[in-house]
Amino acid sequence: MDIDNDLSRILRSNDAPTPIETTSIRSEVEIIIGKISLLHAELQGLEEQLRERQGALSPVRRLPPEILAEIFSSSVEGILDSEGRDALLDLGLVCKNWRRASLGSHRLWASISVDRHQCNETSYQKIVAWLNRSGDLPKTFMFDHIDLDYCECEDHDPAEEPCQMSNPALIKLLSVGPKLHKLVLRCSSHLCFRTLLENIGPEPDLMNPRPWDTLQSLELELATADSSPWDEPLEASKSLFYHLPQVTSLDLHIPYSSSAFEGDPSDTRTVALNVPPRLLQGLKSFTLHCDWEGSHILAMLQHCENIETLIVDFRCEALRYDEGDILVHRFTASRLLLPKLHTIHLQLTPIENTAIFDFLRTPSLRNLRLDMMEYTHKDLQEAEFQKPLLSFIKASNCEGTLQSFHLQNLSLPAMKLARALLDLPLLTTVILDHRHFDADTFWRRMHYHALKNRRNGDTPLCLPHLQELQTLCVPVDDRAVVMAVAKFLMENREINAFPCTWKVSHQTATQAAIERELADLEDCGVSFQVIPSHRWF
């Protein structure tokens, strides 16, 4: 830019400009600012062109529809409620390729969850169209009660305020809708579920089965409203569950005893659930959420001769029986045989509830998971854990089949827990999922047992077939703990020829802080992985 000689003198010195020079300089400043603005606009335009062209070259545009579908499936998981459905539809609005990929992935459309406001005559065809996009894949429908503890039918005349479970669109869907694999129902009371059964009708047309009749999986959650305590008839043919379809997977949420029996849980011993034996005999998977006193669990399990997976949620309540209970005496004298059962999962169970193992015999058991309540130190010292567990395993003769042992919140003293694992030598997977855990003492004890194996051939081998160790929600920021685990695993390699992986879900230590231990483990054939934690607490 040409600059006047007089202005050049001012710009190259520290002299103050005259009024005339000030006016001239200000004029030059405005010209320069204008040119800068033009250049900025040109730069922004060029940057936008660059982004467009780089976007056109992006590998994302060349992803096959199958890969896009896999990515979409990871971003919208589970049974899709209104928010999940909106997220899936938004993916299809990005571009034509994404829309084709989302519509072409049948499993994205295989489930839907609605409440009564989203399940009506207007939306019925939309629900059917959504599920039909899944092609021949198994379909899941969930009817989610808005308020699980309340329904209008409790306080009003049903003619004026109909029960939520008498929803015409719901009845139509279960009667003439698309074939369903799984149905999830959340009802505010057993009376509401009876209303649904009455509207569906008990007698199936064998020549024309309804979606209700051909269900393979049913999850039924029953709450108990204040005005509807449990008053089911004792006669089996009049049972609430008598007309359930012949599913192979049942997830049953029994009402909480405190609400179902007006604060007197012992009344649960005088009633019968009366789940039909023909239904229980056909189950391969059975999940039961029940805190009732009495032998209700045994009464149902005695018919589950084909069950393969059993999950029992005790809701933090201890098992209590009558002293003269016939089933308790029967299965104490001769354990209940469940020949095909390979997976047991006890949830929210007091440690004394492991006594349920005293009644069972499972020769095919492969996977055992215990999710326990937390206890004080005094409680732990008095708790009996090993005896019923090990007696159960011995009576079942499943030492050779039991492969996976998952313990959550079982904060036993370190010595007891180490001894329990020592008595299960054929485990291939051990998962310790504890928030409060004396890890240093435990792993030092495990290392002691492993070291003793090498020095004394007569002692039981310490996890000689271990292939996967998971320490979930257990911090590994303590280098001493890491070293203790590493010493055990390295000693274990001397008697274990199988590849082994150590997985953690809680890592606060830097990689450098434990780099040496991890390198030594890798040299011994043990890989280290940090995995996501899926626990909500």
Predicted regions mapped to residue ranges:
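Leucine-rich repeat
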Residues: 1-537
